[in-house]
C-alpha cells in the first residue's frame, strides 16, 4: 500500500484547511470540510475491509450508502491539521443506508467526524442530484459575509444582487447566486435538512449570524467560491455606509453573461 499522506487528495485537504485557517475563516475549532472519494482512490492506500471502529451517524442517507469521505474531526483546530493529519482528519465508509460510518483511517485520538456531519452528508446527497461531479462540501466563518447578515436583508435575491454588484467576477463565479438561512441551531439534523434543500438551487448557502456552506467539484473550486463571495462582502461592508455613486448595472452583468457563457439565476437580473 502507498503512504496515504502522499495521496494528492490528502495533500490538497491539508493545504486547504491550513489556508482556510490562515484566511481567518476557521477560528479555534470552527469550520469543517468533507471530500467524497472514489473507492479506486482509497484502495491504493488502505485495505477498505480493515475497519478500525464504527460510528453512528445519527441520520439516514440511502443515496450515500457505500460512499467514502475524508472529513475533518469534531473539536479539531484547522491550524493543527498540517502537523497531525491522522488525528484531525478521518476517512470513513458509509454503510447501513448511511446510518453507520466505518472508520478506515484517522481520528487517532478516539475522535469522530465534525458535529456538522449531517449537514455535510445531506448537502452532498442533494448536490450529487444536481451535479454528479460534486465532491466537496465546505463550511467556514468568513467575517465579512457574517457581518453582512447583520446589516443586510436576508432576502436571497437582494443578498445575491448586492454581492454581484460589488465585484465584476462575482456573477461569473457564482451565477447561481447565494441562498440564505435565518439563524438556526447548528449541529442538528434540522439545519442539515434546511441546508440541503437550499443546496438544490445554489452552491453557496449562508447561515445568518454564523457562516457559509459551499459545494463544488473539488477543493479549489469550493474554496474559490467562498473566497469570491467573501471578497464581495468585504467591499460591501466597506462602502455600505457611504453614498453610492457607481455600481455594476444589470445591463453590464448581461454583458458578462454573454462574454463568459454563464446564465444568471432566473429572475435575479432585470
In which residue ranges do the predicted regions lie?
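Glycine-rich flexible loops
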Residues: 1-270
